[in-house]
């Protein structure tokens, strides 16, 4: 299995990448290994207005680099080595937009844990599941934005949808911020955070604009609670206003083993 041998890059590597496994793939590939406690097939979350769909996919390669050519080169190697073994179902090319903004014009990832909060603690499994310590639960969703509807909103209304100022990223005051603002419903507690690695993507000729959500977490319970707050509401019905303009067309849970474990799995 070539993809198991390429997970550990040389220390001088210029770009990071991650190999991730869905529950069914883990069962088939590593039947003797045991399994991360929370790795299971994602069950859709259906609210009154919006649905976090569940879609298939056994493997995910998350490739990042400052130069798109490096991403292409590495993806080409993966594709060549896995020919006849897997069937590609999706390939999304993200890009950095306007100093970290999403396509909708607001800074993305502001709510990530700060450096002094130790992001590693929120993103990586610890000794609570010792056999898989150093790994991470990774949930991905591909969101398509209705840019016509979004751009029809005045900036002040867009800011109420997100809960932050558009041009300086300052959070709205509690008096200004609606209960269903995006950053209100996704804030489920200071001790319940994830690390986002979201990227915008676009195909202008097709009128397709979106955000590829990638959330790394030490426990999927946190991510699911966040999704339930967005799609069902807490209280029920107080759903994320951003979902009126953004539709999730995929939804899959993966697990990223640590470098050391993945090396062992590939032996």
Descriptions of predicted regions:
Residues 1, 21-267:
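Long, histidine/aromatic-enriched segments associated with O2/redox biology
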């Amino acid at each position: 299995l070539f993809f198991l041998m390429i997970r550990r890059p040389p220390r001088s590597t210029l770009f990071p990448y991650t190999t991730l496994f869905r529950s069914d793939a883990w069962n088939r590939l590593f039947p003797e290994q045991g399994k991360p406690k929370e790795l299971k097939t994602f069950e859709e979350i259906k609210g009154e207005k919006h649905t976090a769909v569940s879609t298939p996919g056994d493997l995910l390669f998350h490739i990042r680099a400052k130069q798109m050519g490096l991403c292409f080169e590495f993806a080409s190697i993966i594709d060549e080595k896995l020919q006849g073994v897997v069937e590609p179902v999706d390939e999304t090319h993200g890009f950095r937009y306007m100093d970290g903004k999403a396509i909708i014009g607001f800074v993305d990832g502001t709510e990530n844990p700060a450096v002094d909060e130790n992001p590693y603690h929120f993103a990586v499994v610890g000794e609570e599941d010792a056999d898989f310590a150093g790994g991470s639960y990774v949930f991905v969703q591909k969101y398509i934005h209705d840019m016509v509807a979004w751009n029809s909103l005045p900036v002040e209304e867009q800011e109420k949808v997100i809960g932050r100022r558009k041009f300086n990223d300052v959070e709205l005051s509690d008096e200004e911020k609606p209960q269903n603002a995006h950053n209100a419903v996704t804030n489920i507690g200071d001790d319940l955070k994830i690390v986002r690695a979201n990227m915008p993507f676009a195909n202008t000729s097709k009128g397709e604009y979106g955000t590829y959500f990638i959330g790394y977490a030490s426990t999927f319970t946190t991510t699911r609670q966040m999704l339930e707050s967005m799609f069902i509401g807490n209280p029920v019905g107080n759903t994320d206003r951003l979902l009126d303009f953004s539709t999730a067309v995929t939804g899959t849970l993966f697990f990223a083993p640590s470098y050391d474990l993945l090396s062992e799995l590939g032996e």
